[in-house]
């Protein structure tokens, strides 16, 4: 069952339920690809990219939402694209839900350490607590949009893609270290 939190999550859950119902009724051949939070090159619009990685790249203080020690699964955007193409071109993959492959989870503290190793220098970070987001929320449209995602940052947010890894064992997953080396 889907347990959506927020306006956008409710819409996504309804869409997924509609697709799954049509698949179940043999009215539609489709796949659903699910992914954890994206990170990647260029203009990837994710919390981790915009608040954390982009700031590090700009040599500014990076922001960590809510909690720096919770583990998070992240997927490299080029990996997500390659995985979806692979699934789409595999007839036996249809009429299923797939969790796209990602590296092991890391905390923001660990991401900071990896970034420091890649850059060979110290990185400045600060944690923005939930009450701080709530304080700014009435005055900032971006924070209003972001607020429905904040519960995901209170605790570990782990993504399991074992089914994909078993079905496609030769798929090369970009490690967080490789990804950060490319971005930074």
Model-derived features with residue positions:
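Alpha-helical membrane-targeting segments
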Residues: 51-73, 124-157
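Residue-level signal for the nucleotide or nucleotide-sugar donor/cofactor binding architecture
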Residues: 10, 75, 106, 159, ...
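NAD(P)-dependent short-chain dehydrogenase/reductase
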Residues: 25-32, 36-71
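A conserved structural motif in NAD(P)-dependent oxidoreductases
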Residues: 73-80
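Short, flexible helix-coil linker/hinge segments at the edges of structured domains or between repeats
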Residues: 1-8, 49-54
């Amino acid at each position: 069952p889907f347990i959506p939190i927020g306006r956008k999550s409710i819409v996504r859950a309804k869409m997924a339920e509609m697709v799954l119902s049509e698949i179940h009724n043999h009215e539609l051949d489709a796949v659903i690809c699910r992914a954890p939070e994206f990170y990647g090159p260029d203009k990837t619009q994710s919390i981790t990219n915009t608040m954390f990685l982009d700031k590090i790249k700009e040599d500014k203080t990076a922001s960590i939402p809510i909690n720096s020690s919770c583990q998070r699964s992240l997927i490299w955007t080029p990996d997500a694209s390659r995985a979806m193409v692979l699934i789409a071109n595999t007839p036996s993959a249809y009429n299923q839900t797939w969790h796209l492959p990602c590296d092991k989870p890391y905390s923001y503290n660990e991401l900071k350490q990896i970034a420091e190793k890649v850059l060979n220098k110290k990185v400045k970070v600060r944690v923005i607590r939930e009450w701080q987001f709530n304080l700014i929320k009435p005055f900032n449209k971006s924070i209003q949009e972001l607020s429905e995602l904040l519960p995901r940052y209170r605790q570990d947010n782990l993504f399991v893609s074992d089914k994909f890894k078993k079905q496609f064992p030769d798929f090369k997953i970009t490690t967080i270290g490789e990804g950060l080396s490319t971005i930074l």
